[in-house]
From Swiss-Prot:
Keywords: Calvin cycle, Carbon dioxide fixation, Chloroplast, Lyase, Magnesium, Metal-binding, Methylation, Monooxygenase, Oxidoreductase, Photorespiration, Photosynthesis, Plastid. GO terms for biological process: photorespiration; reductive pentose-phosphate cycle. Heterohexadecamer of 8 large chains and 8 small chains. Binds 1 Mg(2+) ion per subunit. It is found in: Plastid, Chloroplast. The active site is at K166 (proton acceptor), H285 (proton acceptor). This is Ribulose bisphosphate carboxylase large chain. It comes from the Eukaryota. The record marks K325 as: Transition state stabilizer. The basic functional RuBisCO is composed of a large chain homodimer in a 'head-to-tail' conformation. In form I RuBisCO this homodimer is arranged in a barrel-like tetramer with the small subunits forming a tetrameric 'cap' on each end of the 'barrel'. Its cofactor is Mg(2+). GO terms for cellular component: chloroplast. The modification N6,N6,N6-trimethyllysine is found at K5.
């Protein structure tokens, strides 16, 4: 008939297309959908596809001015979640033309910007995204990547060691710099600003940068190793953030830091471009991630945030510990650690990976294990994360009974012992405690650390677990 048919029609008539064959250029999404009672899964899945692409609640005559078939998102497959009543995984394909090139901001605004408040859904979670190579090639990605970082630091064949300076708020710049020096001098590769250290009344950013640079150069001169401190450039405006990064570059330090979720993807991508152009490494903290990713049935899984960060740009990102005080189940954590580091990752539902992901030539990101870890965890961390990682001990360095430098010595000795044992073919998982005990005979600092933390464990069940097979 001529003209258009006004009124409301079911989403599934247009947006549920089980016969659709996905294209190599489509962005694919896996959503965990919990429909409201009485809403069939096909309608719920189609609603997700519609509301995150071309749809609106009623038919509009301007639909006739474009080709919906070319631009609409399509829900092409739905499967029930085993062990959960009323939960479904809905797979949605989005045509590449819906997205601005090189903009994580636009990608998220489209895919998750509006649909999560949709009334027909009780809850909605984005579990995974497949980013096609055609879209990945529009991003610069990490400023440098894993291999370039190793070459800049001249450190190979072992994980890197870090430490967050505590107390995170309240120290003066000079005392802060002193703690940085002691940790680096003791044997750590990096120290770190906490995520909420920006430029507060008790310590303005410029003073901190100067004292930390002094600490770095002094520790480098005394140890003959390249050292770094993650200078947090996060600020209230984009211009101020870049100003801080420029000052860090002028001081000649190797690395700056950004809180990418609170700072925002637009600011983060700008900073990543600046860092590549000017030879700075970029450490990323994921402050605010648990607001988005912790609930199992609503929000966005961290593996999606991790993929987005690799596209936006960062050389390090915090990725849980598996063994410390912060959330992270082993298989799931290793799944997104591989997504950060490797060039090509096969679909593997047992690790929560819903799609095969090809990163083509985008550099990798080093995962950072941080939060409630100490020397007794070293064998497990070395085994789980391997060489391309940063192991970060805040309290596990600064809480040493003899002070900061001995705390750093203890961590470095423990790490070197674990790496040597692994290279000799010993089983770190089975012999970990024995390896640490042997090493502590040769290091009084390590022996003291072993004594303090011998019984500390953070044993709680993970909130976000895999579905039963």
């Amino acid at each position: 008939s001529v003209g258009f048919k006004a009124g409301v029609k079911e989403y599934k008539l247009t947006y549920y297309t089980p016969e659709y064959e996905t294209k190599d250029t489509d962005i694919l999404a896996a959503f965990r959908v919990t429909p409201q009672p009485g809403v069939p899964p096909e309608e719920a899945g189609a609603a997700v596809x519609a509301e995150s692409s071309t749809g609106t609640w009623t038919t509009v005559w301007t639909d006739g001015l474009t080709s919906l078939d070319r631009y609409k998102g399509r829900c092409y497959h739905i499967e029930p979640v085993p062990g959960e009543a009323d939960q479904y995984i809905c797979y949605v394909a989005y045509p590449l033309d819906l997205f601005e090139e090189g903009s994580v901001t636009n990608m998220f605004t489209s895919i998750v910007g509006n649909v999560f408040g949709f009334k027909a859904l009780r809850a909605l979670r984005l579990e995974d995204l497949r980013i096609p190579p055609a879209y990945i090639k529009t991003f610069q990605g990490p400023p440098h990547g894993i291999q370039v970082e190793r070459d800049k630091l001249n450190k190979y064949g072992r994980p890197l060691l870090g430490c967050t300076i505590k107390p995170k708020l309240g120290l003066s710049a000079k005392n802060y710099g002193r703690a940085v020096y002691e940790c680096l001098r003791g044997g750590l590769d990096f120290t770190k600003d906490d995520e909420n250290v920006n430029s507060q009344p008790f310590m303005r950013w410029r003073d901190r940068f100067l004292f930390c640079a002094e600490a770095i150069y002094k520790a480098q001169a005394e140890t003959g190793e390249i050292k770094g401190h993650y200078l947090n450039a996060t600020a209230g405006t984009w211009e101020e953030m870049i100003k801080r990064a420029v000052f860090a570059r002028e001081l000649g330090v190797p690395i700056v830091m950004h809180d990418y979720l609170t700072g925002g993807f637009t600011a983060n991508t700008s900073l990543a471009h600046y860092c590549r152009d000017n030879g700075l490494l970029l450490h990323i903290h994921r402050a605010m991630h648990a607001v988005i990713d912790r609930q199992k049935n609503h929000g966005m899984h961290f593996r999606v945030l991790a993929k987005a960060l690799r596209m936006s740009g960062g050389d390090h990102i915090h990725a849980g510990t598996v063994v410390g005080k912060l959330e992270g189940e082993r298989d799931i954590t290793l799944g997104f650690v591989d997504l950060l580091r490797d060039d090509f990752i096969e679909k593997d539902r047992s690790r929560g990976i819903y799609f095969t992901q090809d990163w083509v030539s985008l550099p990798g990101v080093i995962p950072v294990a941080s939060g409630g870890i100490h020397v007794w965890h070293m064998p497990a961390l070395t085994e789980i994360f391997g060489d391309d990682s940063v192991l970060q001990f805040g309290g596990g360095t600064l809480g040493h009974p003899w002070g900061n430098a001995p705390g750093a010595v203890a961590n470095r000795v423990a790490l070197e012992a674990c790496v040597q044992a692994r290279n000799e073919g010993r089983d770190l998982a089975a012999e970990g405690n024995a390896i640490i005990r042997e090493a502590s005979k040769w290091s009084l600092e390590l022996a003291a650390a072993c004594e303090v933390w011998k019984e500390i464990k953070f044993e709680f069940k993970a909130v976000d677990t895999l579905d039963p097979e």
